[in-house]
Amino acid sequence: MNFGKLVLDRPLLALLANQGCKYVIARDAETRQPWFVSVDPDGSMGGQRADRSAMGASTRPFETWIAGGQLPEGARSVEVELDGERYPAKVRAGFWLVGIPWGNRDREGVIRFENREGELVKAEPFDLWLAPRPPR
């Protein structure tokens, strides 16, 4: 998969959401740096280096927010809790990815990173805010 001048390896993790947009975490074939990339059905792409514990993206119609990132040291599983609802993440090769129903509305919660025994390694606030609307 090519992203600009980058050549990305086969995705480590991938999710489809928002009417066919593909969200992936993949490594740069040359530098091995991880990238979080969204690929629209028309082939247009956007992304950033996946070098933080949490990041995310959504595309029109903003039904689902895709969050992902690197696992903190010692973490083996991830769960996002928003407004009392829990969403377990896919985890592989030190990274995580999860689809969260959003509907372009404000949601507040936390990301929990747990070790193999289910003990909390780290918790971070996780808030989703209404996307800005274009002027009329």
Regions inferred by a protein language model and the residue ranges of each:
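Intrinsically disordered, low-complexity prosegments and terminal tails associated
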Residues: 1-136
